[in-house]
UniProtKB/Swiss-Prot annotation:
Source organism (scientific name): Vitis vinifera (Grape)
Complex formation: In plastids the minimal PEP RNA polymerase catalytic core is composed of four subunits: alpha, beta, beta', and beta''. When a (nuclear-encoded) sigma factor is associated with the core the holoenzyme is formed, which can initiate transcription.
Function: DNA-dependent RNA polymerase catalyzes the transcription of DNA into RNA using the four ribonucleoside triphosphates as substrates.
Keywords: Chloroplast, DNA-directed RNA polymerase, Magnesium, Metal-binding, Nucleotidyltransferase, Plastid, Transcription, Transferase, Zinc
Name assigned to this protein: DNA-directed RNA polymerase subunit beta'
């Protein structure tokens, strides 16, 4: 349905019998009303055409072929001539065959039938409204015992108003035998009620507002009593109070949605459109049918049998009628939810029939498979791995996935740049994976974000936008900082990638869904892009060099032997820890590390900017090195000061490692990038 704001929505609930008939009924030009399915047949075995008034009737559900009736006559759909809309011979409407996807029918039940979802599902809505135990209601619905029916302002023979017959044990077996005697039909119908009809009468007599008032009064009385001191009694009172709250909420829901309680008992059973329960012909002429068709046939067979028994009620024993009503109830239960009452119904191959509940519920049901989690175009899925070289807003997309997702954009780019004359030539170039294809693909991807989603999407950070980058392999590369938002781990987790097509979707992805714009948790406001797991280990490895300073390392007698043995040999350079190298800038230090002249933890001296805090420090140097030109080096625990002959300070060196330098450069670049972004916004 579509609301006043033009939002498409789906509402599931009870409907009245009048609404069910309005969905299905059609009036022919001769005044005949069609819509009721009365025959359990599907297709005629000779003509292979739908049976009239059957489960695939063209009069009820529409033509199989657009504009062609059952007689074979053809008429243009939407023709403005004054030709009749229905065929005069067969009564089939000249409409599009797609009507068979939504045109419904109905089965007029010979007796009321309780909807098993409202009776057997927990909590039982019928039991809550009637304030009766579920076991008693089940016995009444399935004709295991009877109910004394009070007639308004008239005394009954039993004088039992609203009580179950089992309450009087001496009458438990005598009442059914007495009132099912032949010739007592009128008397029996006046005094005894059983089956779903008894439930319907009680639901029809309910006043929901009175239920709310009485339940509220009882709840207050129980609350005022206080604890009794008996644990069992206190639990019983607590359960009763919880039940009263659920009962009031249920009654309010019925009032708010304009649903009558008696609608939970069916008089008309809706029949699904034929296209939703198809019969398909496979190789060899064999037919494959939906299980729902067989369950519908079972209902129609039993309902027609009950109708025949009721039309000849004078010669039919009452117990036989009650047993047939029970069979109709069980057939409808199997159609709606097979196996809810115990042993499910099976076919000849011992396979359980799929009921209506099985079709719509679960991971492979109608909602989750075809509406909520259905397969969509321009999407793919792969395993995620760490992409340490990526920016926060980037993701690595495998070439194999990218060339499929962006194929239409790639074809357009090849044709626009006159690299392909038509679509066929462009597809041929893509299949051959020519070098120009990858260049055009990179241009297409440069301004087109993609969406990454990890199921289950429990909050809005479960799907975020990224700028795709082509990578080798078959795994999607992801920045480790966005892992927490997706609640993902790099141990085999899979993620889906989607391509937003419209300009509106791309704008929304850029403005609202980019990963670098979702740094805080929407629930509590804490930072969600924080280093964890591998990143913490990496930070520890980068900064795990000796931090005890030169005094503890060089002059510790326990470590002096290690200094003699620990060295890095290279063809052009020889370094020992007793001779720590000097570097003018961080680029030289990282270059030496990449050429394997020093390792990640090797202490070194890095020239640093003059710092007044170090110059003004009153710390005494550990040692002083004098040079021949008169300059000298004052060596401290973590830094070194170079002084001239005039005691001026031309430069300062700090003692660090390549790991510390790399971490500092990353932090510095991040701060500079943030400052540039802030300056652009202002």
């Amino acid at each position: 349905m579509i609301d006043r704001y033009k939002h498409q929505q789906l509402r599931i609930g009870s409907v009245s019998p009048q609404q069910i008939s309005a969905w299905a009924n059609k009036i022919l030009p001769n005044g005949e009303i069609i819509g009721e399915v009365t025959k359990p047949y599907t297709f005629h075995y000779k003509t292979n055409k739908p049976e009239k008034d059957g489960l695939f009737c063209e009069r009820i559900f529409g033509p199989i072929k657009s504009g062609i009736c059952a007689c074979g006559n053809y008429r243009v759909i939407g023709d403005e001539k004054d030709d009749p809309k229905f065929c005069e011979q067969c009564g089939v409407e000249f409409v599009d065959s797609r009507i068979r996807r939504y045109q419904m029918g109905y089965i007029k039940l010979a007796c009321p039938v309780t909807h098993v979802w409202y009776l057997k599902r927990l909590p039982s809505y019928i039991a809550n409204l009637l304030d009766k135990p579920l076991k008693e209601l089940e016995g009444l619905v399935y004709c295991d015992f009877s109910f004394a029916r009070p007639i308004e302002k008239k005394p009954t023979f039993l004088r039992l108003r609203g009580s179950f017959e089992y309450e009087i044990q001496s009458w438990k077996y005598s009442i059914p035998l007495f009132f099912t005697t032949q010739g007592f039909d009128t008397f029996r119908n006046r005094e005894i009620s059983t089956g779903a009809g008894a439930i319907r009468e009680q639901l029809d007599d309910l006043d929901l507002r009175i239920i709310i008032d009485y339940s509220l009064v009882e709840w207050k009385e129980l609350g005022e009593e206080g604890p009794t001191g008996n644990e069992w009694e206190d639990r019983k009172i607590g359960r009763r109070k919880d039940f009263l709250v659920r009962r009031m909420e249920l009654a309010k829901h019925f009032i708010r949605t304009n649903i009558e309680p008696e609608w939970m008992v069916l008089c008309l059973l809706p029949v699904l459109p034929p296209e939703l329960r198809p019969i398909i012909q496979i190789d060899g002429g064999k037919l494959m049918s939906s299980d729902i068709n067989e369950l519908y046939r079972r209902v129609i067979y039993r309902n027609n049998t009950l109708t025949d028994l009721l039309t000849t009620s004078r010669s039919t024993p009452g117990e036989l009628v009650m047993c047939q009503e029970k069979l109709v109830q069980e057939a409808v239960d199997t159609l709606l939810d097979n196996g809810i009452r115990g042993q499910p119904m099976r076919d000849g191959h011992n396979k359980v029939y799929k009921s209506f509940s099985d079709v719509i519920e679960g991971k492979e049901g109608r909602f989750r498979e075809t509406l909520l989690g259905k397969r969509v175009d321009y999407s793919g899925r792969s395993v995620i791995v760490v992409g340490p070289s990526l920016s926060l807003h980037q993701c690595g997309l495998p070439r194999e996935i990218a060339i499929e997702l962006f194929q239409t954009f790639l074809i357009r780019g090849l044709i626009r740049q006159h690299l392909a004359s038509n679509i066929g030539v462009a597809k041929s170039q893509i299949r051959e994976k020519e070098p120009i294809v990858w260049e055009i693909l990179q241009e297409v991807m440069r301004g087109h974000p993609v969406l990454l989603n990890r199921a289950p999407t429990l909050h809005r950070l479960g799907i975020q936008a990224f700028q795709p980058i082509l990578v080798e392999g078959r795994a999607i590369c992801l920045h480790p900082l966005v892992r927490k938002g997706f609640n993902a781990d790099f141990d085999g987790d899979q993620m889906a990638v989607h391509v937003p097509l419209s300009l509106e979707a791309q704008s929304e992805a850029r403005l609202l869904m980019f990963s670098h714009m979702n740094l805080l948790s929407p629930a509590i406001g804490d930072p969600i892009s924080v280093p964890t797991q591998d990143m913490l280990i990496g930070l520890y490895v980068l900064t795990s060099g000796n931090r005890r300073g030169i005094c503890a390392n060089r002059y510790n007698p326990c470590n002096r032997r290690n200094y003699q043995n620990e060295r890095i040999d290279d063809n052009n350079y020889r370094y020992t820890k007793e001779k720590e190298p000097f570097f003018c800038n961080s680029y030289d230090a990282i270059g030496a590390y990449r050429h394997k002249r020093i390792n990640l933890y090797s202490p070194l001296w890095l020239r640093w900017q003059l710092d007044q805090r170090l110059i003004a420090s009153k710390e005494a140097p550990i040692e002083v090195h004098y040079e021949s030109l008169g300059t000298y080096h004052e060596i401290y625990g973590h830094y070194l000061i170079v002084r001239s002959v005039k005691k001026e300070i031309p430069c300062i060196y700090i003692r660090t490692t390549v790991g510390h330098i790399s971490l500092y450069r990353e932090i510095e670049e991040a701060i500079q990038g943030f400052c540039r972004a802030c300056s652009y916004e202002t």
